[in-house]
Amino acid sequence: MEEEVAALVIDNGSGMCKAGFAGDDAPRAVFPSIVGRPRHHGIMIGMGQKDSYVGDEAQSKRGILTLRYPIEHGVVTNWDDMEKIWHHTFYNELRVAPEEHPVLLTEAPINPKSNREKMTQIVFETFNAPAFYVSIQAVLSLYASGRTTGIVLDSGDGVTHVVPIYEGFALPHAIARVDMAGRDLTDYLMKILAERGYTFSTTAEREIVRDIKEKLCYVALDFEQEIQTAAQSSSLEKSYELPDGQVITIGNERFRAPEALFQPSVLGLESGGIHVTTFNSIMKCDVDVRKDLYGNIVMSGGTTMYPGLSDRMQKEITALAPSSMKVKIIAPPERKYSVWIGGSILASLSTFQQMWISKQEYDESGPSIVHRKCF
């Protein structure tokens, strides 16, 4: 038995939960952050029906369940369900006893303070962890890309945020957060598919639309041009087979859905697109650091995985930036999990070991210690 106990790293996204051991290069467990409850009463006695299902099991039985995501826009809205997800992570996915390992969790920037305190409380009181730390997601993504300076555009399922970081410090006054991400794009795709005559209504059918989005959507370099191309020929059309064997065809919906990232007004949101948000964030930073930020725009999270997104981002930011400025978009291939990878790197650093909040410190100070130790 080695003397070092591996820390557990859990990146609780609004859509997927990524969990594993510090020092690994990829998460061991990746499963949907879903808790499902049966819609109907069981009639077969002795089937051992559960009153709730978590993750992949909820996903596979979705036809008879009502699916709920306990994390909305990066903030935990249902703590009972969240506890179920953590319980599932420790005991079923990682098969570890949480009282034996330090636990690193992640959160979105500009989250309510109470959210962090409650997280801390549950980890120490329900799961009896020996040590705990909570880190900001975008900062971890930057670690994973091997940089200490850059601006991270982190867009997942529930929240998108832009965080400028200089020499390892997030610049809090310039952090921008947009409550528009993958889930909103899925909803928007549901809506525009309905206009084509394909209706998806239940929580289970929404998962089908999410799959269509992940497999077929892309970002157009020139939106107007692409709309014309789609109208004139069927070259952009793709077909998708539904679980029951029916085949549907989708055309301009393929790029109209992700276009909402650049034109949130189609979702009825007032915020600027991700390119404008990134540019504004850079402009809020000191004039001396801007050059380094323009040259290190790091993509992170599942919603940045669309083909064509980096090129479009490059084009849009270059148009906004001063003409002589060198703009560089960094899109690491493993960016879907870069937050987790950054957490794995951080938790295994020898210099990090004195940063943990210990159970003893927690017992002395209570949950508010998280604001003093984690920033």
UniProtKB/Swiss-Prot annotation:
List UniProt keywords, sorted A-Z.
ATP-binding, Cytoplasm, Cytoskeleton, Hydrolase, Nucleotide-binding
- Keyword ATP-binding belongs to the record: yes
Gene Ontology cellular-component terms for this entry are: actin cytoskeleton; cytoplasm
Origin: domain of life: Eukaryota
> A single Pfam family, by name?
Actin
Disulfide links within the chain:
none
At the top of the EC hierarchy, this enzyme's class is: hydrolase
Q: Which InterPro entries match?
A: Actin (IPR004000), Actin/actin-like_CS (IPR020902), Actin_CS (IPR004001), ATPase_NBD (IPR043129)
Which EC number(s) does UniProt give? 3.6.4.-
GO molecular function ontology, one term from the record: ATP binding
Compartments annotated for it: namely: Cytoplasm, Cytoskeleton
Q: Catalyses which reaction?
A: ATP + H2O = ADP + phosphate + H(+)
Is Membrane one of the keywords UniProt gives this record? no
Give the family per the record. Answer: Belongs to the actin family.
State its role.
Answer: Actins are highly conserved proteins that are involved in various types of cell motility and are ubiquitously expressed in all eukaryotic cells.
PANTHER family assigned: ACTIN
This protein's name: Actin
